[in-house]
Amino acid sequence: MSEDSEKEDYSDRTISDEDESDEDMFMKFVSEDLHRCALLTADSFGDPFFPRTTQILLEYQLGRWVPRLREPRDLYGVSSSGPLSPTRWPYHCEVIDEKVQHIDWTPSCPEPVYIPTGLETEPLYPDSKEATVVYLAEDAYKEPCFVYSRVGGNRTPLKQPVDYRDNTLMFEARFESGNLQKVVKVAEYEYQLTVRPDLFTNKHTQWYYFQVTNMRAGIVYRFTIVNFTKPASLYSRGMRPLFYSEKEAKAHHIGWQRIGDQIKYYRNNPGQDGRHYFSLTWTFQFPHNKDTCYFAHCYPYTYTNLQEYLSGINNDPVRSKFCKIRVLCHTLARNMVYILTITTPLKNSDSRKRKAVILTARVHPGETNSSWIMKGFLDYILGNSSDAQLLRDTFVFKVVPMLNPDGVIVGNYRCSLAGRDLNRNYTSLLKESFPSVWYTRNMVHRLMEKREVILYCDLHGHSRKENIFMYGCDGSDRSKTLYLQQRIFPLMLSKNCPDKFSFSACKFNVQKSKEGTGRVVMWKMGIRNSFTMEATFCGSTLGNKRGTHFSTKDLESMGYHFCDSLLDYCDPDRTKYYRCLKELEEMERHITLEKVFEDSDTPVIDITLDVESSSRGSDSSESIDSLTYLLKLTSQKKHLKTKKERNSTIASHQNARGQEVYDRGHLLQRHTQSNSDVKDTRPNEPDDYMVDYFRRQLPNQGLAHCKLRLPGSRHSPASASRVAGTTGTRHHTWLIFVFLVEMGKKIPLKGTDLYGNCFKVTSLQSPMGKQTSTWTEKTRIPTEDLHHNLKSKIKECISFQSKKTGINWTDDEKRSYKDKGIVQTQEILQYLLPIVHSTKNMQTTQIKQLFNPRTNFQIQHQLNPATCRNIKKYSTSWTAPRNHPFVIQGDVMANSSEWVQSKPHRSLESLSPLKGPKKNKHSQIWAIKNEDIKPLSSKWETASSSFGMDANVLKYKSLQAEETNQQSSKHTALHLTKNKDEQANKNDGQPTLYLKFQRES
């Protein structure tokens, strides 16, 4: 054993040396245990010549007591010279002498999930005196809490109410990890089953594992478990029960397999306590007569299986050199919690430079799939492959394969013998009540003082979701570096195992109810990569494994993929690392933009890639059973308000609402007065109005002669009020990307990264307070945080002073301005695209398409090619119900003969202040650039608008816009000319540039 391994032995030596045998714990059983093992400690003698110590054992041989030193079995966990540590049960539990063993077997092809036929029945079993009880376990509630344990538990036999001469099935579950409380025969071949809740609780009924004998082959039996508590289950999504036949195992070497027909998970009648329960029913035909069969929720993995596995490692001369097995602590029932230290032994100081990796499993005893993943990990890391050797040379692995052996032994689903969920008590100071998690946390704390811990992972099972995924932790600081780095390892795992691991199902939020879980506690202790790996009880929905169940080999393979991903994560060649980092940046950019524009009231700092779902089938379930012997919780009395206080509160609320209504009307009136003298600088022209668009704002950008032509009558002074009428009650930001390129070049915009090197992305800011012809240009590098850009896009107006009236706003008016968003400032009119048009002198077909919600909004633009060099990004303030960006779609074509046909899409009707589902409409804008002969003249020609708006001034001077027409049929966009020849003649042979902008929700 290396020097480093000696110093890092975090075993619970304070209690491991005084509990070697059963007689040390309970003196009432000393005589029975002495008769069996014929051992006695020197401390048991009253002779003063014998030293009072527990380290000397007296063995009775040939009529005399022979002293010898106690073997350090507790120190090393398992010993090659002696048997395994005996399994201890609560004293009242009945245990059969028969040892249950199963063979390892993997089906030749993946087992498909069950597809409902629609003919499944829902049996309901009212209480009937004619029903026969065929199995009844001993009452588990003789004591309100755990008292003490002993080897073998209570060996009093339980008589069956039937014999072998009857055709009634015989049930048994009094073995390790077995769970079955009661069985009632309701028909000749139909049985109603009740599973036992976790000991010392009245809930957590999910795990079942029982034996069936005395069956007849070819008979259709129905089994119905009637006391599940979860409304949602994977059985509703095609999961099948597991079945094991001893005759099939001996004859054909077939192990656990998925079986069952007529599978149905449904809500049944309420129980006696008024709670609603859920039933699982299935039918099955046994393959053999008089066979011994088993049914289970998932592949069983018992405490004895773990001890046998660890004993094999300890007896292996090769693996035992780099895998040291110790006892971390003892549980409430005095069962051992093992810890493994896996690393290549080194006697020099280089071993301290190694980083540590921590893995734990089976904190929830019913999640047996976590033990199979742990087994796969240990098989690989202890193997002789070059990658395994590299991992052992690089890291120090601390592994706790079973955190809750007590719960595993008695067949609990979630809790320990304390009646509590251990994965909610990592912050608890009750070492005696939750020893395994207390010592695990202490071990990690001491380990972090000596070396860096790069990863912690707690293995779990999930009862409501398919696939395998992870839960991580996000910081409140929202640092982009840490924010993305915490997602790199799960992303690598999904790439190494694409048919089992789902990155999209991974969640990274830290909720208050999860603060006691292992991953959150370890993350707060300083472990950046702190995860919970969730493995489904069912199967996969990905790749080649889609629609099939996971086998034990599938679960074990996740241990290999975990090691493979760990090598990729720590590879000195950072190619894969940065590739995943770049992919995560793209995911964040797209998903965050979608969430920003879905609800612009949400601050950017609060927008994340995910919202962790409630995982009551995983590490996030609540266990709030109170134990008086653990902690006495004093109930807090709720102090009710007096009638006078309640009336005062109601009156204050009414006054606040009245003041709010008054302030709103007052602000709206002042807003109308302050904008009454706003002058429209756009010129009037006889047949169509031309908007001097961006002329004053961008004189130095080659857009001095950029005009927007809209069909219809002359621009009336009421246009400003009409445009204002289209604004909603929220402030949003519209992003208009104007691409200035050299003519004659074709730039592929589809899939182009706006943050890449092929574009120069800038932001333009205008000085507040006076009109100026210069603009301040700020160039942002692509690696800057995306959140900074998003915050700058949706920031509110920084000036609360009216530009025309010179009136200063009060604090209350500013607050109301922010809350209600009803003020339209002059800056909006400087950048606002005119969207209200007249239908005068238009064809009937054009009018129909004008008011068609599916018609595209087209813009024709002329630019000066002399200044077309850079890409500029302009941000204009817009007040619409939803905030959506313009997304580039298609290619930029410098050929006037190539017309891009518009795709049917939703219109700009979402700009109207409508409520309900109409807020999520889509729209798109086509910008068509025509090059003219004159170098300094350019025009924006706009086709018919895709919708019509009618603004009305209502009572209290509130503005409301109504959509005039909403047709659902699909139309193509109006062309600006009747045919291509006319367009070519109109442009005098000059090339045309098409820009297509699409706004999506």
From Swiss-Prot:
Residues 299-570 form the Peptidase M14 domain. Zn(2+) binds at residues 364, 367, 460. One of its GO terms (biological process) is proteolysis. GO terms for molecular function: metallocarboxypeptidase activity; tubulin binding; zinc ion binding. It comes from the Eukaryota. Coiled coil: none annotated. InterPro entries: Cytosolic_carboxypeptidase (IPR050821), Pepdidase_M14_N (IPR040626), Peptidase_M14 (IPR000834). It is found in: Cytoplasm, Cytosol. Its EC number is 3.4.17.-. Residues 648-657, 962-971 have a biased composition (Polar residues). It holds the Pfam family Peptidase_M14. Metallocarboxypeptidase that mediates deglutamylation of tubulin and non-tubulin target proteins. Catalyzes the removal of polyglutamate side chains present on the gamma-carboxyl group of glutamate residues within the C-terminal tail of tubulin protein. Specifically cleaves tubulin long-side-chains, while it is not able to remove the branching point glutamate. Also catalyzes the removal of polyglutamate residues from the carboxy-terminus of non-tubulin proteins such as MYLK. May catalyze the hydrolysis of aspartate from the carboxy-terminus of target proteins. This is Cytosolic carboxypeptidase 3.
